[in-house]
Amino acid sequence: MRYGLSAQRSLINVCSRRFFGKDAKEQFLKNLSSIPASKHPRLVSDSDANSAMSVLIPLVTVDGRDSVLLTKRSIHLRSHRGEVCFPGGRMDPGETTTETALRETFEEIGVNAESVEIWGHLKSVIRRQADFNVTPIVGYISDERVLENLVVNSDEVQAVFTIPIDELIKKAGLTKFQSKRMKYTLPSFDSTEFKVHHNAPNEYLHSTQRVWGLSGVMLHQALTLLNPDVYKHDLIVKFF
């Protein structure tokens, strides 16, 4: 089930707002440093490459609008097929979380490390089954022309698109989950306003894209740190 956030948020005018201004990185790091560094008690060891992953949350200004880049996984994959996510994957032995995120981004969509300015690490996110954790790395792509020369791995990625941050904030909502063992609520984001930079030939791309699950949790973290004066919430997320 999906529930909208408070009416107060829906009344906030965030159109045409700039989020990646001159002091954006410094403010982001200041907000990040104010968060307690404690880890989720169920997180697996960061040194276990078999159960540790990292992703890049790429920030980029497209057509004058500050945006977040996402990918849609190929429908031909065995797991999480067709889901919207950030580029990333499992850590190789000896890699740092940043190195993994940048390597996977290059392998999936062809954006090289030199094009990304790393802003910082968010709290690792744990999967409900507690079998692996994912560290989100926030990075800024200063030149949007990078998106004109994507080299997409069609075995893994169907589409690459960007969603303006003001659109994400306006469309933010909550999704309630219930299983035999637990109930929980996670942030989710439905967008009808996005720019497609790549889509595989003959593959259908829906007019609404939903960011939810772990990707929604990671996006929620990033928006909280980027725009705490606009993206206001009282949701306690149990997965980081």
Swiss-Prot record:
Entries under InterPro entries matching the protein: CoAse, NUDIX_hydrolase-like_dom_sf, NUDIX_hydrolase_CS, NUDIX_hydrolase_dom, NUDIX_hydrolase_NudL_CS
Function statement: Probably mediates the hydrolysis of some nucleoside diphosphate derivatives.
Taxonomic lineage: Eukaryota, Metazoa, Ecdysozoa, Nematoda, Chromadorea
Sequence intervals crossing the membrane: none
Residues that bind Mg(2+): 104, 108
PANTHER family, A to Z: MITOCHONDRIAL COENZYME A DIPHOSPHATASE NUDT8, NUDIX HYDROLASE
Name listed for the protein in its UniProt record: Nudix hydrolase 3
Gene Ontology BP, a term: nucleoside diphosphate metabolic process
Molecular function GO labels: coenzyme A diphosphatase activity; magnesium ion binding; manganese ion binding
